[in-house]
């Protein structure tokens, strides 16, 4: 697996679990909301969820995303 493939997998899974979170919770999380909750800027989440993701994400930010979405971090891989 290449680095680019891994970035796409992680990004797609962040989007999938954010949308699942929205399906099961009254509080809906936009990309902006998620970014705010992890202390990042909105473009990070947008780029991460994009199939043209060339930014990647730090382990710390992925950990924070996993906590906000209540998803074990390994589910993103």
Q: Residues of each region from the PLM?
A:
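DNA major-groove recognition helix of helix-turn-helix
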Residues: 49, 61, 77
């Amino acid at each position: 697996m290449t680095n680019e493939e891994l970035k796409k997998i992680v990004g797609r899974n962040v989007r999938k679990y954010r949308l699942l979170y929205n399906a099961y919770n009254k509080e809906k999380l936009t990309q902006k909301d998620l970014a705010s909750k992890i202390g990042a800027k909105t473009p990070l989440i947008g780029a991460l969820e994009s199939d043209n993701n060339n930014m990647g994400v730090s382990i710390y930010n992925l950990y924070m995303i996993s906590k906000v979405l209540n998803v074990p971090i390994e589910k993103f891989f």
